[in-house]
A protein has these predicted regions:
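Short, conserved, GDST-rich strand-edge loop motifs in beta-rich repeat architectures
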Residues: 84-104, 191-222, 274
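A short loop-to-beta-strand structural motif that recurs across blades of beta-propeller domains
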Residues: 44-47, 107-110, 150-152, 227-229, ...
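Blade-edge beta-strand/turn elements of extracellular beta-propeller
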Residues: 12-16, 51-67, 110-131, 152-171, ...
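Beta-rich, blade/repeat-based domains predominating
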Residues: 14-36, 63-82, 89-90, 103-109, ...
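Blade-level signature of beta-propeller repeat domains, shared across WD40, Kelch, NHL, RCC1
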Residues: 251-279
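Beta-propeller blade signature
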Residues: 52, 101-114, 224-233
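Conserved beta-strand positions in repeat-built beta-propeller and related beta-rich domains
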Residues: 30-32, 36-42, 82-93, 125, ...
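Single conserved hydrophobic/aromatic residue that forms the stacking wall/gate
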Residues: 1-7, 11
Length: 279
């Protein structure tokens, strides 16, 4: 579980607090040695061992020497390499709206190699690099571009290795996290449906600057809308799960499949959501 304590974020086990990152943990996964690897928006890429000891793995890219500002999500390959996103190299955690309304490509997809302890930038100029997920055979990795309503695909193997292409674009909402069920389906959590004002102001920077000066309560707000898509590994939508209601579990910012259920997480909604995997 993730719990908040005096504005610091703690990893909790069933008996209480297991470890305190003193930052803001977001995406996480266990490596082959049962260390919990965490994309911490404040601390960077970190590792927590079985005893709860926190170790910093990386705080900047060694290939371009640019420090992280907003490490967001990760996935770990069978060879131990950690693929992760830095949502923005300009704005830190809590400044999502600035990144949205400025609409500049400050995000990156990176890889950390535990064998060499080096971090390499794979893709840059992304519009809020968010969720990260490897394909079933690990021939490619996906990274969500939240503010462009699309998902990028970076090839790791084969003739296209080292190149990228759009996996899917023109999504009906803002893609947040993405995960693979390792059976050919990517589950994508959409924070919210597309916003009319964001669409209209996309090529009007002066208007976006005016809105940013307004109190947050007067700025465009998300609606109560649960939204998850299931994509096959060719980028085709095979599941479209939506529910709009004042009682909706929203916003959904992460989704994971475990056996026959989907589990939903949210940055703002207390608790977890759960439904059966649709047929």
């Amino acid at each position: 579980r993730i719990g908040r304590r005096q504005r610091q974020m703690c990893i909790r086990d069933s008996d209480g607090i297991f470890s305190n990152t003193k930052g803001r943990p977001l995406g996480m996964a266990f490596d082959s040695e049962e260390n919990l690897i965490i994309a911490d928006a404040v601390r960077g890429l970190i590792s927590i061992d079985r005893d709860g000891k926190v170790k910093t793995l990386s705080t900047k890219s060694d290939s371009d020497n640019i420090p992280f500002k907003f490490v967001d999500d990760l996935d770990i390959a069978n060879d131990g390499k950690i693929y992760f996103s830095d949502a923005s190299s300009k704005y830190g955690y809590g400044s999502d709206r600035l990144e949205l309304f400025e609409h500049t490509p400050n995000g990156r997809l990176l890889v950390y190699d535990p064998a060499t302890k080096e971090t390499t930038t794979l893709l840059n100029d992304l519009y809020f690099a968010n969720g990260v997920a490897l394909s079933t055979d690990e021939s490619f990795v996906l990274v969500n571009e939240t503010w462009m309503y699309r998902i990028q695909k970076y090839w790791l193997k084969g003739e296209k290795a080292g190149t990228s292409e759009v996996f899917i674009e023109n999504l009906p909402g803002f893609p947040d996290n993405v995960s693979s069920n390792k059976e050919g389906i990517f589950w994508v959590a959409l924070f919210n449906p597309r916003n009319n004002f964001v669409e209209m102001s996309s090529n009007k920077p002066f208007l976006r600057k005016i809105v940013l000066r307004l109190p947050e309560l007067l700025q465009p707000q998300p609606i109560r809308h649960s939204f998850v898509l299931g994509l096959d590994e060719s980028g085709k939508i095979v599941h479209n799960l939506q529910y709009q209601s004042n009682k909706a579990y929203s916003p959904i910012t992460s989704v994971k499949q475990y056996e026959n259920h989907l589990y939903f997480g949210s940055l703002t909604h207390p608790g977890w959501g759960k439904i059966k995997v649709p047929k």
